[in-house]
């Protein structure tokens, strides 16, 4: 057993199962991005023995755009966000779902600011992305947050449907509790390597070029 908060539990799984992590901090998800950046800076490796590349973009829109590019080149990618940050990602979430990109976005759910800023928790952010085509999985404890993070990374590879894994901001993201940690060998044994290989084979490559993102008329769209 280890003592950890929800953000730390999720970040650990996401970091160890990813190759490219695009970030832009926003409360209360910031510590997931901060920990991933610190781990990469310290040379911590993922389950395949590589140090994930963590890149901070200019906004959440840039972060999800970087994720999209990484996925198109066959990398395993993830990101973290909350509130208005999630809303900035909506256009690209539609693209990721439509292009069947395996990807997990970890969301510490938080109130969307309207007449005033609020950093407190509700589901107004995640409820705004229900129509994007992404699957959604909600965790309600620190243990669930860790376990569902892994389940999301497995399920998105199996289904080629992007997953939004969310949990309550502060109430779960900052809750400190004892959990049973997931070891590297457990992660590696549960991740579907055949689906990872298929994802890499679909990568854009100048050796066998393809066209993606074309314009379509109503008869075929």
Predicted regions and their residues:
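Short, contiguous, pocket-lining structural segments
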Residues: 6, 28, 144, 157, ...
